[in-house]
Amino acid sequence: MARCSNNLVGILNFLVFLLSIPILAGGIWLSQKGSTECERFLDKPVIALGVFLMVVAIAGLIGSCCRVTWLLWVYLFVMFLLILLVFCITVFAFVVTNKGAGEAIEGKGYKEYKLGDYSTWLQKRVENGKNWNKIRSCLVESKVCSKLEAKFVNVPVNSFYKEHLTALQSGCCKPSDECGFEYVNPTTWTKNTTGTHTNPDCQTWDNAKEKLCFDCQSCKAGLLDNVKSAWKKVAIVNIVFLVFLIIVYSVGCCAFRNNKRDDSYSRTYGYKP
């Protein structure tokens, strides 16, 4: 059993080591080949994750297979902190994504999104001007609205209203239905200058391709709807990852006890069993 737990920890950490290689390579590739600032923004976190997994895996591998007790202790301490971190992140993700959803519009295939429907913490992230300028730049570079226009440019208004748009397309690429603007094409609308609008997005809308509704509250809400969906998926993956970490940690504790017992035996009898 002693050998089994040490060998199992070694095998699991060898698999983690193999996993860290493509993650690290992907981060390096992004830093060198990323065509936009948004793509390059991910390189440092990905590289850091790859290096972290590699170092932890090597520590666990050496500590268990070579029976280096102090190194295995450090490995288990880091694993314990990682389990706490993943648990807290998972709970936090569920808490901040429990609010907010698109609002169905009568007679329309798409939904519209309001910033106030989402959690206060998420709202503060996008209402920060510095944060939003970076996000806005990424949205423009992704050509989310240009692709929408190219896809539906010749579609008549009645057909366009029946389309199922994504949260970003609905929030960033067209004005709110409350504005009552006249449809020309998916990203070009004629403003109604005679009416008064309570929705501030109606004044923010601009037909210029680099502006559109990228500064609208609806665009920020559309982004948060995407974030909400993504975080819920990440939280589910985190639960699986957490179970894996707990299993590895438990087996690692067995290996640590084995190492301590062997060290004690060695001090008493002069050799390891």
Swiss-Prot record:
It comes from Arabidopsis thaliana. Residues 1-7, 67-75, 257-273 are cytoplasmic. This is Tetraspanin-8. The keyword Transcription does not apply. PROSITE patterns: TM4_1. Belongs to the tetraspanin (TM4SF) family. Pfam families: Tetraspanin. It is found in: Membrane. The chain crosses the membrane at residues 8-28, 46-66, 76-96, 236-256. Residues 29-45, 97-235 are extracellular. The keyword Transmembrane applies. It comes from the Eukaryota. GO terms for biological process: auxin-activated signaling pathway; defense response to Gram-negative bacterium. It is a multi-pass membrane protein. May be involved in the regulation of cell differentiation. Disulfide bonds: none annotated. Glycans are attached at N192. Keywords: Glycoprotein, Membrane, Transmembrane, Transmembrane helix. One of its GO terms (cellular component) is plasma membrane.
